[in-house]
UniProtKB/Swiss-Prot annotation:
EC number(s) per entry: 1.1.1.41
Subunit structure: Heterooligomer of subunits alpha (IDH3A), beta (IDH3B), and gamma (IDH3G) in the apparent ratio of 2:1:1. The heterodimer containing one IDH3A and one IDH3B subunit and the heterodimer containing one IDH3A and one IDH3G subunit assemble into a heterotetramer (which contains two subunits of IDH3A, one of IDH3B and one of IDH3G) and further into the heterooctamer.
Function, as annotated: Catalytic subunit of the enzyme which catalyzes the decarboxylation of isocitrate (ICT) into alpha-ketoglutarate. The heterodimer composed of the alpha (IDH3A) and beta (IDH3B) subunits and the heterodimer composed of the alpha (IDH3A) and gamma (IDH3G) subunits, have considerable basal activity but the full activity of the heterotetramer (containing two subunits of IDH3A, one of IDH3B and one of IDH3G) requires the assembly and cooperative function of both heterodimers.
GO cellular component entries: mitochondrion
The organism of origin for this protein: Canis lupus familiaris (Dog)
Catalytic activity from the UniProt record: D-threo-isocitrate + NAD(+) = 2-oxoglutarate + CO2 + NADH
Family: Belongs to the isocitrate and isopropylmalate dehydrogenases family.
Official protein name in the record: Isocitrate dehydrogenase [NAD] subunit alpha, mitochondrial
Free-text activity regulation comment from the record: The heterotetramer and the heterodimer composed of IDH3A and IDH3G subunits can be allosterically activated by citrate (CIT) or/and ADP, and the two activators can act independently or synergistically. The heterodimer composed of IDH3A and IDH3B subunits cannot be allosterically regulated and the allosteric regulation of the heterotetramer is through the IDH3G subunit and not the IDH3B subunit.
Keywords assigned by UniProt, alphabetized: Mitochondrion, NAD, Oxidoreductase, Tricarboxylic acid cycle
Amino acid sequence: AIEVQTVTLIPGD
């Protein structure tokens, strides 16, 4: 994740 990462349960984020 190239951003402010919140709790996102997505593989490959």
